[in-house]
């Protein structure tokens, strides 16, 4: 067994990292108008350079910008699309025991990709990487699921199928724009697929006017549309998440409800699946994972706490997964990012880096150096 030279890597990570103290301070000052946008950008640049070096130092073969220029893992990208309007809501997104800021989006025009600030964000990352620069954007399925039909103006889209068609085209153009900027490793971050595995979330989707039994096929189709014409030398993966905010979560349930469509009908190069606790269910749904060149990245190390898992426990879980997927098609990562929003999970930066270092060590021990 060997290490991989192309992404996803044996030791990988989802993308977001805990915001550093200087960055947090600069964001507070910017919110108070004590510094201007250029001053904040300078701090972001400096802190991103530091965390890129740190990722390289712990032995990772990839580096992200930690999403240091974002407040949210998804809304920042959505708001950069034409036809999308930011809104303030009466309540935030409800997690277990905690609620997010009261922000959301609505579709007020035809959805289009006509350039995006995150293209420049990627160019900065690439210019400062000695390893493979990895960019993360939300998946097209996530664009729809949390708000459903209520998200989409019936004046703009009386036919919801046209909405999904435009979304597929917008993401396809985004993928091409990142490729043209030099991106060869792109991840689509998603909550829709894993949340559909929770019966409570499926019932809620009905109240939003959706048919949860049809959504897996719909989301697989829009993902395939987004990937049409993908260059052969570009790896595109998807991370599937049950919610990650201040170390809390939203959904639970194994992948059985979506596994056939998610793993077999989306044309992705790799899949990051959460498997850090019992809420993720067992490995049985992995029987739907196709044999061949695709990679399955097991999220066995939690990003929700600083406790280091015993290495033997992780190795045992990897061995259990090989009942369904060959070891050569497996990789290892944390179950999610460390800071899906700027608030971050409840652990220390040193604990975050210790987890990533351990993942690199485990990859060497399991797959060889």
Label the predicted regions.
Residues 1-369:
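Domain-level signal for soluble alpha/beta catalytic cores
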């Amino acid at each position: 067994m060997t290490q991989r030279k192309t992404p996803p890597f044996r030791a990988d990570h989802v993308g977001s990292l805990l915001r550093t103290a200087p960055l947090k301070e600069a964001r507070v000052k910017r919110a108070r108008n004590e510094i201007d946008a250029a001053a904040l950008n300078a701090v972001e640049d400096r802190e991103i350079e530091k965390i890129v070096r740190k990722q390289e130092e712990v032995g990772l073969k990839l580096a992200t910008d930690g999403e240091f220029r974002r407040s949210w893992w998804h809304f920042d990208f959505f708001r950069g699309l034409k036809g999308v309007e930011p809104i303030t809501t009466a309540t935030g997104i409800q997690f277990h025991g905690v609620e997010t800021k009261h922000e959301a989006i609505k579709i007020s025009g035809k959805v289009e990709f006509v350039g995006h600030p995150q293209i420049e964000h990627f160019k900065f990352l690439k210019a400062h990487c000695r390893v493979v620069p990895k960019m993360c954007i939300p998946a097209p399925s996530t664009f729809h699921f949390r708000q459903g039909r209520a998200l989409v103006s019936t004046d703009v889209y009386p036919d919801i199928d046209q909405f999904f068609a435009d979304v597929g085209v917008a993401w396809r153009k985004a993928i091409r724009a990142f490729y043209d900027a030099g991106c060869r490793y792109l991840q689509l971050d998603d909550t829709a697929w894993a949340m559909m595995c929770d019966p409570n979330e499926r019932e809620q989707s009905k109240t939003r006017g959706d048919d949860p039994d049809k959504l897996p096929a719909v989301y697989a189709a829009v993902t395939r549309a987004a990937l049409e014409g993908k260059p052969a030398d570009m790896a595109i993966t998807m991370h599937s998440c049950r919610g990650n905010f201040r170390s809390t979560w939203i959904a639970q349930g194994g992948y059985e409800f979506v596994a056939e469509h998610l793993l077999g009908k989306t044309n992705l190069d790799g899949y990051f699946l959460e498997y850090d606790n019992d809420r993720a269910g067992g490995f049985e749904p992995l029987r739907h994972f196709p044999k061949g060149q695709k990679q399955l990245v097991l999220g066995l190390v939690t990003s929700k706490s600083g406790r280091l898992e015993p290495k033997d426990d992780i190795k045992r879980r990897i061995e259990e997964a090989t009942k369904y997927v060959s070891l050569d098609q497996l990789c290892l990562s944390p179950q999610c990012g460390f800071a899906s929003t700027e608030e971050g999970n409840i652990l220390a930066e040193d604990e975050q880096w210790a987890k990533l270092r351990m993942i690199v060590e485990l990859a060497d021990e399991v797959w060889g150096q």
